[in-house]
């Protein structure tokens, strides 16, 4: 009996420990590295993720035990690829599994360099990003750092070249950004690609040790230094052409353009931008959700089984934003409601009313099956979509007006015809033909 109690106690303690560990574990993140030394050279970036609660698993990109999916389930929530020159991933990871991971809603952060391998190039093509050739680099003869060795590949990117989206790049002004790596261009037919950081008008991508004999792959503002993607399923991917961008040396380095009269900054803006990008790509920022949705006739509190045409209705929706791990009310002034039956019959702005958004409007004089639809798609935020289906019926016979003012001419014409027929009948019945004389 005592042994049975002891066994039950041990099992209970084990389940309790598993439950506690599951509650404490943060987002599971797999980090694929070029070599193990990256944990030291990029320690500030990884430490910031750990401090924010991420459960990091460090492995080399060619580790034979690598796996993203097991028994149809994703083993990780996020994927970091800091292995630019990898030619083949280890284990069962390949471009197909990474694409499936993105299709399943996973978040991916990719850092490349001039030594870029085919797998990252192929992954970029899947996401609408085209990397330049191996051994090429972004070159700018006007905006390079004072410590550049002479090839003008240590680029100083101004914060004015950042995407105007505080949710993605942060709200605070940034110092100039150091960049050394490969250039990218976006697929013009892919509207989901985000130009997060572009080169200046004097930048281009080419082989730094060769003379220019052909038109460069990327020129001017078309040269992407950092690009992003938010898929239609709200999965997020960020591509950086520079692995050094996330390094401790670039985080702590002073920065100054080589041009005379340029200002010197004690630190770059790399750390702040890297933190903002990681918070966005790993869905700590810019995540919206729909809370309670309600609708009813004005003056009532519950929805009817069916509305009647021309009813005055009130629609309310609660929209929340993820902030510091907590859901808080979202503040927006451009949220619209559509009342749709194939096409919108009503489109109006929702007004914030306390902790919810609401609006009152009159239903159209059209019956059928309609939807209250909120389709909110803004730069940097997850796609918010909410639909509620209702029925709108015509007026019942007892609900019509006894006399319709607009029908008075028809009433008059009907009664005039009746009156004329009555007079004609009297005249016709009492009319007597004159007798003919012999």
Curated annotation (Swiss-Prot):
Instruction: Please list which residues make up the signal peptide.
Output: 1-25
Kindly give the membrane topology term recorded for this protein: Single-pass type I membrane protein
UniProt GO BP = protein glycosylation; protein N-linked glycosylation via asparagine
Q: What does this protein do?
A: Subunit of the oligosaccharyl transferase (OST) complex that catalyzes the initial transfer of a defined glycan (Glc(3)Man(9)GlcNAc(2) in eukaryotes) from the lipid carrier dolichol-pyrophosphate to an asparagine residue within an Asn-X-Ser/Thr consensus motif in nascent polypeptide chains, the first step in protein N-glycosylation. N-glycosylation occurs cotranslationally and the complex associates with the Sec61 complex at the channel-forming translocon complex that mediates protein translocation across the endoplasmic reticulum (ER). All subunits are required for a maximal enzyme activity.
* Oligomer status and interactors: Component of the oligosaccharyltransferase (OST) complex.
Q: Which family does it belong to?
A: Belongs to the DDOST 48 kDa subunit family.
What is the designated name of this protein? Dolichyl-diphosphooligosaccharide--protein glycosyltransferase 48 kDa subunit
